Structure formats: structure tokens, C-alpha cells
């Protein structure tokens, strides 16, 4: 899976200055890590004297990106991999200078990487992994009967399901797009056998996933 680091995206000339000082609208996606980074932004901006509003768990990438472009929010945390694979998809952009230039052309600024990262992984329940002797992605080739439930963004990304399927020659045909939270519930209930994970998800330990 592709390495994915965090950075911050903001609308250039964002923030409003009122009688009591600047105001900043922070956005975050619908999962814990994004909300936590959003809260860090809130505390940082507040400590600088700004009046800050945090719009938590707004949704997925497109919702946050469109909100940023329209000025509904001023800043939000984003994955560098998501920027290249979704927001700037098809442009052949990879390096940070190229990413920054392409975003600047749309009036969007980007911070330096925040110094930590997250990656996609495939998760299955530990007992199923033991029974089927699955320890790595290539082992899935031997089990075409497995049912996959992936986040909708993962289903569409070039480095998501399409790239994973082609790279490993995965034969599974029962593959559906789900909300990330619903996929965890589906895995627990037995409706699906495998899902995409963020490697920092607390649910990995909670649900005893491999």
C-alpha cells in the first residue's frame, strides 16, 4: 500500500477579521484521526487569538475539498496520497513542489508534511486469517470466495481496489463499496470477510483484526 502522510490544506487569504480578531473555520473528515488533527488546529489557532469553529466529521474527501474551495471552511488536514490520487488525479503529479504548485493554481495553500503518516491495509478477523492461513495480501489469491467491503473512496482510487486487484491478480468478485464505519460493522457481523483499513485505526485492536 502507498505511504500516506498528513499535511494541511487552506484557502489562500482565508480567515475573516472582525472587531474581536480573526475567525477561522476548521474542517475534518468522518474518522477519528482527522478529527483529532482538526482539534489540534483549533487549539493552535485559538492560542494565536483567533475565534475558531471546528466543523467535525463533515464527510469524505470531495465534501471537504469542495467546502474549502467555496470558503465554507478555511483549512483542513489531508493525506498527501489523497491529494495526488483523488484531488489531482490524472495529472501525473507526485513530488511536494509539484503538488504545491498545482494547488496554488486553485488558490489553495499546503503546509509541510506534519511528520507522521497513515497507510491503507487490508484487514480480516484474526480467527479467519488463521483458519485460511492468510498473512499477506498475495495469500488472498487462494480464496476467491472471500467477500470484500471497501470504503467508497478506496473503491475508486487508482492506488485503492483497482490497483490492488491488478497488482496481485485478486480474483474476488463480491466486492462492494461501503461507508468506512459500516464496513467495520459488516466485518464484525460476518456480512463481509475483508475491508480496507487505515493503519492507525483503533478498531484494528478492538475487533482483533489482522
What is each model feature region?
Residues 5-14:
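Bacterial N-terminal signal peptides
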Residues 79-99, 185-210:
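A ligand-binding cleft/hinge motif common to bilobed small-molecule-binding domains
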Residues 63-116:
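N-terminal segment of the mature folded domain
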Residues 68, 140, 186-188:
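Hydrophobic residues within well-ordered alpha-helices
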Residues 54-66, 173-185:
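Short helix-initiation/N-cap motifs at beta->coil->alpha
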Residues 96-148:
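A conserved helix-loop-strand patch within extracytoplasmic ligand-binding domains
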Residues 20-33, 50-56, 144-149:
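Short, well-ordered beta-strand elements
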Residues 41-49, 137-176:
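Ligand-binding cleft/hinge of the Venus flytrap
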Amino acid at each position: 500500500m502507498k505511504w500516506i502522510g498528513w499535511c494541511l490544506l487552506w484557502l489562500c487569504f482565508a480567515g475573516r477579521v472582525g472587531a474581536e480578531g480573526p475567525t477561522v473555520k476548521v474542517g475534518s473528515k468522518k474518522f477519528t484521526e482527522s478529527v483529532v488533527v482538526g482539534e489540534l488546529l483549533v487549539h493552535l489557532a485559538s492560542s494565536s487569538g483567533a475565534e475558531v469553529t471546528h466543523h467535525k466529521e463533515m464527510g469524505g474527501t470531495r465534501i471537504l475539498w469542495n467546502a474549502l474551495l467555496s470558503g465554507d471552511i478555511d483549512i483542513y488536514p489531508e493525506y498527501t496520497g489523497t491529494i495526488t490520487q483523488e484531488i489531482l488525479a490524472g495529472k501525473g503529479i507526485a513530488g511536494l513542489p509539484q503538488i504545491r504548485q498545482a494547488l496554488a493554481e486553485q488558490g489553495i495553500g499546503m503546509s509541510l508534511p506534519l511528520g507522521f503518516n497513515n497507510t491503507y491495509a487490508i484487514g480480516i478477523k484474526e480467527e479467519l486469517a488463521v483458519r485460511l492461513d492468510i498473512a499477506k495480501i498475495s495469500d488472498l489469491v487462494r480464496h476467491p470466495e472471500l467477500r470484500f467491503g471497501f470504503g467508497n473512496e478506496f473503491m475508486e482510487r487508482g492506488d485503492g481496489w483497482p490497483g490492488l486487484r491488478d497488482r496481485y491478480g485478486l480474483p474476488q468478485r463480491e466486492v462492494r463499496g461501503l461507508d468506512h464505519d459500516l464496513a467495520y460493522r459488516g466485518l464484525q457481523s460476518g456480512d463481509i470477510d475483508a475491508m480496507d483499513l487505515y493503519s492507525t485505526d483503533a478498531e484494528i485492536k478492538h475487533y482483533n483484526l489482522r
